[in-house]
From Swiss-Prot:
Biological process terms in GO annotation: rejection of self pollen; signal transduction
Pfam families linked: SCRL
One GO CC term on file: extracellular region
Known role: Truncated and inactivated form of SCRA, a protein involved in male-mediated self-incompatibility when active. Most A.thaliana cultivars contain such an inactive form and thus, are self-fertiles.
Family to which this protein belongs: Belongs to the DEFL family.
Paired cysteines (S-S): C42-C52
Signal peptide positions (record): 1-26
Protein encoded by which gene: SCRA
Species for this entry: Arabidopsis thaliana (Mouse-ear cress)
Listed name of the protein: Defensin-like protein A
Keyword Membrane: no
InterPro entries per UniProt: SCRL
Swiss-Prot/TrEMBL keywords: Disulfide bond, Secreted, Self-incompatibility, Signal
Compartments it resides in: Secreted
Misc. comment: By contrast to A.lyrata and A.halleri, self-incompatible species with full-length SCRA isoforms, A.thaliana is self-compatible with impaired SCRA protein.
């Protein structure tokens, strides 16, 4: 019984780690994608990045 619980907990931890790494990779891709759409405009300050993301969101909704 103890081995089964240990196995289930280890599987759960592995699944959580894999999901975390997938989210990190998705965030890296998103930054690169924004840099390709708005070259030179989104990298200067935080407000510009926010405006570029909002503009991109408006384009996808339209």
């Amino acid at each position: 019984m103890r081995c089964v619980v240990l196995f289930m907990v280890s599987c759960l931890l592995i699944v959580l780690l894999i999901n975390h790494f997938e989210e990190v990779e998705a965030q890296k891709w998103n930054k690169c994608f924004l840099r390709d759409i708005f070259p030179g405009k989104c990298e200067h300050d935080a407000n510009a990045k926010l405006r570029c993301k909002e503009d991109d969101a408006k384009k996808t909704l339209a």
